[in-house]
Amino acid sequence: MTTETNAQEAEQSAVPSAPRKSFGGRWTYGVIIMAFLFVLMPFLFWNATWFGRPLTDTQLGLALANRSHPREIQHALAQIEARMEAHDPGVRHWYPAVLALANDPVDEIRVTDAWVMGQDNTSQDFHHALVGLLTDSNVMVERNAALSLVRFGDDAGHAQIVAMLRPYTMASPLAGTLETRLKPSDVVNPGTLLAHVESPGGRKEVRATVPGTLERWLAQNGTAISAGQPLLSLQPSESMVWEALRALYLVGRAEDLPDVDRYARGGDGFSPQVAQQALAASRAIRSRATS
């Protein structure tokens, strides 16, 4: 750079830039309000769906009686579970309501209820209710009941637990023409839309009943299917496998070893912790078989 060039640059930098127009007070307040709403709305949604938000006894009673909002009942059940884990002596006041929900017509409520009843293995009323839920119309209710029964030292749900380690065949709930929506390797959760079935009565949805990964369709897209016909195969989710292996550590039998050892070898896209749990379950089963 020459001295002349430096002088020119200094002169240019000394020239004040043209003043920018202000947004004005209204625009400023508008931006602040919008920013606040962007923060507030996700919080309100989270606060309304997060089951960890504590409830007073009054709120708990109102939530359990809120038949128009099943998630409020689920929230109440989650709070009852938290009180059980904290060994709150007053939680037994809510046990009759928990027992009554075992017969609730809403599947999601029974799924949660079956899990919550397993948190107090001293309640024989819970024990009896869980045995009844092993034949529930919803497979997730059956599975949660089977896992909860293990806490009572009861392996009556052994078959349901072992099934959690295997692919799940989902049957069509109705007859009609199949319109598949997902492809193999897609991950699903209970409630995920899998397909539509076109019938004279209209276009109906088919949703997943268990979590997992779509292995393959057992019926072809565009073909006629009947109610009860095998529709697809789902590989089990990691959470299902993990819970089943934890249960089989306690109640597994020698005939379960082929299913357990498959996970002990690792793979299937699962975390190393699953293989470690499978190995622990395998050792526990072998120890019981030889003792």
Task: For each feature predicted by the language model, list its residue ranges.
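N-terminal intrinsically disordered, acidic low-complexity segments at the extreme N-terminus
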Residues: 1-20
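Amphipathic alpha-helical scaffolding segments comprising HEAT/armadillo-like alpha-solenoid repeats
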Residues: 50-64, 85-103, 121-135, 154-167, ...
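Short inter-helical turns and helix N-cap capping residues of alpha-solenoid HEAT/ARM repeat scaffolds
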Residues: 68-69, 105-106, 137-138, 169, ...
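Residue-level detector of extended alpha-helical repeat arrays and alpha-solenoid scaffolds
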Residues: 73, 110, 142-143, 241, ...
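Conserved hydrophobic register position within alpha-solenoid helical repeats
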Residues: 76, 113, 145-146, 244, ...
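Structural signature of alpha-helical solenoid repeat scaffolds
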Residues: 81-82, 118, 150, 249, ...
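Short beta-strand-turn/beta-hairpin segments enriched in glycine/proline and small hydrophobics
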Residues: 162-178, 193-212, 233-236
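Acidic, glycine-anchored pre-beta loop/turn
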Residues: 179-189, 217-229
